[in-house]
């Protein structure tokens, strides 16, 4: 299962404009590797990077409002349980 999210604020990364992201469900081991003790924001960034198959550096370029929407949408869709 995958989910597509259209960004309100597209961004540039490695010379291309990114206006929509696609996320896949995570495997248990991926969630474990993404979890950063005591740092929920870093965990959320890593989860987004793994599930979108983009580097962390790309995820860090996402507008904060879009990132909040992404976190909410992935949580509501059951892609991961309270890693953010």
What are these regions, as identified by a protein language model?
Residues 2-84:
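Short, surface-exposed, charged amphipathic helix/loop patches that serve as local interaction elements
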């Amino acid at each position: 299962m995958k989910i597509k999210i259209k960004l309100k604020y597209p961004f540039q990364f490695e010379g291309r404009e990114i206006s929509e992201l696609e996320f896949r469900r995570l495997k248990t081991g991926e969630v474990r590797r993404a979890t950063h003790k005591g740092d929920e924001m870093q965990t959320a960034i890593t989860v987004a990077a793994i599930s979108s198959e983009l580097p962390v550096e790309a995820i860090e370029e996402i507008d904060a409002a879009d990132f909040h929407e992404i976190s909410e949408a992935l949580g509501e869709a059951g892609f991961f349980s309270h890693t953010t």
